[in-house]
Amino acid sequence: KFINHKNKSLSDEKDNLYYYDKLVIATGSKNNLLGIDTKEYQKGNFFSLRNLEDSKRIRKKISEVQTITIIGAGFIGLEIATTALQLNKDVTIIENSENVMGRSISKDLSKWLINYYTKSGIKFIFNKSFKSFKSDENSIMNIILSDDTKINSEMVLISAGSQPNDLLFE
């Protein structure tokens, strides 16, 4: 309930008081949803992969649409892009840097993967980021990028990393 750094104590919801020498708060992480309201995820056009239920929702939606936009070219984004491509979907990946899997692999391997995925049919947009979106009554969205480029898509998967799960401190 409360943390008192001065006297190194914390209390719970029953006002029990606990003292500590060192306090580690490990609340984990949550997906970076790029500031998109969770109501948009509930409408069923935006997706993010965190658990089995998310995976089932993504799988169902992929079977219903033709155009898929993935924001983020990390492991999850590339894996879902590959799956969608195998199902003959039109896939575009938006990445705010010039590499895929930039935090995990070398630039040379990244270039090789970009070439491989491009030859397979995946379209890449590099050095641009998600800015906003507009949707119509047919569930077609205009994804608006940082340079105001617009991309039409029926489904958007956000795989743009994670952020601290700081709900405890709100």
Which role does the model predict for each range below?
Residues 6, 42-44, 89, 119-123, ...:
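A short helix-to-beta-strand connector/capping loop
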Residues 63, 107-110, 140-142:
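Short low-complexity, flexible loop/linker segments enriched in glycine and/or proline
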